[in-house]
Amino acid sequence: MKIPQKISLKLLILFLLINLGEIMAQQLPQYTQYMYNTATINPAYVNENNRMDATLSYRAQWIGIDGAPETKALTVSGIINNKIGLGINIFKDNIGPSTEFSSNAVFSYYLNLSKKVKMSLGLNAGIDFFEVDYSKGSYYDQDDILFSYDNYYNALPAVGAGIYIFSDNWYVGFSVPNMLINQSNVESDKNLIHRDNHVYFMGGYVIDLSASLKLKPSILVKTIDNAPPTIDASLNVLFLQTFTLGASHRLKDSYSALAGFQISKNFFMGYSYDYSISDIGNYNQGSHEIILKYLMPRWGPNARSPRFF
């Protein structure tokens, strides 16, 4: 079968939505390198050792499809006196004619469950701005009243929570980044912008193969109302506390290759490539994701964390 060089995702998505009689807001962004920036999906996670970190990420999904998802994100987080975590999560997500901008403040509190095991409880609160520009793209039904608008804007509150339990070599977590099921009437009861709940379960274990080599298998399960669960299984290796290599499989969706490099004591860069195996894989050249993390100087004791997560 000849694969078209470029197709319009706007047309495909809007054709389906019109037939369903419902406009859905963008769901939360998808990340392949979530293990390097867990705070994006769990407000209970922050870096340890009395320091802040700032992470920039960029994801271009389904290269070759016009209007495919594109995500830019900034996360800043840290812990004070090994007890209180503070941070912000900001992202901008584009797909077809729709754009979402989200800004959240994050607070977490750490508890010692034992000498080796800690637990963090986290909350996030903020606001999501949503826009649909109906002037973009071509539509199946040009006479639909919904598309007579030039633009649609809305702002919706967001409140989430999470829990993160960990030791030096393992972790488990549970989070709901937005517990509010938001919806807004566009024109009639059948045309709604809304977001379903996202629930994340995560876990990982670090195996010390030698003094300079660590192996970390991990899993992330994401469930969304009225949709099948998404399961990410990954395996990452850390060499000399400097280089990371990994592979990941998103069940029935994609295979991924990951690489990271600790450029200096304060800078880390990561890259991932997703090869799509779903039906839409016939029409795209994969997905790219880049992250850049800056570890700010410590303001407390200069103890190096043994964690590889």
Report residues per predicted region.
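Intrinsic low-complexity/disordered segments
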Residues: K2, I23-M24
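Bacterial N-terminal signal peptides that target proteins for export
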Residues: M1-L12
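Subset of outer-membrane beta-barrel
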Residues: Q26-F309
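Bacterial N-terminal signal peptides
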Residues: K10-E22
